[in-house]
């Protein structure tokens, strides 16, 4: 039996030295599939946007705690973001220019200067596109907004993720008649997002003005906003070498075989990736 596992280890080493295998996973912030709670309060308390106004911006901090599912790997490549919205009563098309910026940061909170919360300076555009949301097709139903990044963003282990999103209407009148016509689902994780809302001025222009980085209520900013339920699609390449030998698992942890297939619960004996490490399951 000992020789059998030594042989498996040798095969694994040859396999991974010959070709680095990328693995895919999804990280859910909040209960994405079964979300029931919406953002409360004013229209400026909704992330990643509100269709009630023509121009919005949002900054969201996803900490290592929220991203714990990938922290066993040296890094992950973020491929896409998906948010979930309920279309209560809107039936017209909404067209927006959408831009997404991503940065790795050490901070887990927004700074406060003279009692005023501060936006982060932002850079590193990873998505830019014009999106038309066909709300009539989702009248009275859930709708997912998925954004596939034009280039993957690499996030190193131990870093927090700052996501800045800008939505600009092509026509300032292209808005819903009520803040409650379209509502995004909240994760319940409070204080990790801040918003900007205006019917005439883009967040990009605001970021170039003298009031930035202040997030003042008089500027239509929400400063204690929940993270929305979010699905983050990632890929990662595990390190080489066998790290440990395990008995067949019965838990809910994710294991990947050498073909990149995902397993949970009991699985056949073999070589798997678990928490960014190669393990032998016997």
Name these PLM-found stretches:
Residues 232-259:
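Residue-level detector of functionally pivotal "anchor" positions at catalytic/ligand-binding pockets or at interdomain
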Residues 21-107, 170, 186-238:
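Beta-sheet-rich sandwich/jelly-roll-like modules and their strand-loop junctions
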Residues 99-188:
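Aromatic- and Gly/Pro-enriched, solvent-exposed loop/edge beta-strand patches characteristic
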Residues 3, 271-282:
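C-terminal tail/sorting-segment detector
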Residues 85-87, 165-172, 274-278:
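Short, flexible beta-strand-to-coil junctions
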Residues 1-24:
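Bacterial Sec-dependent N-terminal signal peptides
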């Amino acid at each position: 039996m000992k020789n059998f596992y030594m042989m498996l280890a040798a095969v694994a080493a040859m396999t991974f030295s010959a070709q680095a295998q990328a693995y895919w996973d999804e990280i859910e912030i909040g209960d994405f599939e079964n979300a029931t709670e919406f953002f409360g309060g004013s229209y400026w308390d909704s992330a990643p946007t509100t269709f009630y106004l023509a121009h919005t911006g949002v900054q969201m901090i996803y900490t290592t705690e929220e991203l714990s599912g990938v922290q066993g790997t040296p890094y992950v490549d973020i491929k896409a973001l998906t948010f979930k919205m309920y279309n209560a009563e809107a039936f017209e098309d909404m067209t927006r220019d959408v831009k997404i910026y991503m940065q790795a940061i050490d901070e887990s909170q927004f700074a406060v200067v003279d009692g005023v919360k501060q936006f982060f300076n932002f850079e590193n555009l990873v998505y830019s596109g014009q999106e038309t949301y066909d709300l009539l097709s989702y009248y009275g139903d859930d709708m997912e907004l998925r954004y596939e990044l034009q280039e993957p963003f690499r996030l190193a282990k131990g870093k927090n993720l700052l996501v800045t999103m800008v939505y600009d209407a092509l026509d300032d009148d292209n808005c819903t008649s009520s803040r409650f016509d379209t509502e995004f689902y909240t994760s319940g994780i409070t204080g990790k997002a801040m918003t900007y809302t205006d019917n005439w001025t883009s967040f990009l222009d605001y970021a170039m003005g003298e009031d930035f980085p202040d997030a003042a209520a008089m500027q239509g900013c929400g400063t204690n906003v929940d993270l929305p339920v979010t699905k983050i699609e990632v890929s990662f390449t595990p390190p080489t070498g066998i790290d440990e030998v395990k008995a067949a698992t019965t838990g809910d942890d994710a294991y990947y075989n050498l073909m990149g297939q995902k397993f949970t619960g009991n699985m056949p004996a073999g070589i798997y990736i678990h928490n960014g490490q190669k393990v032998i399951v016997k």
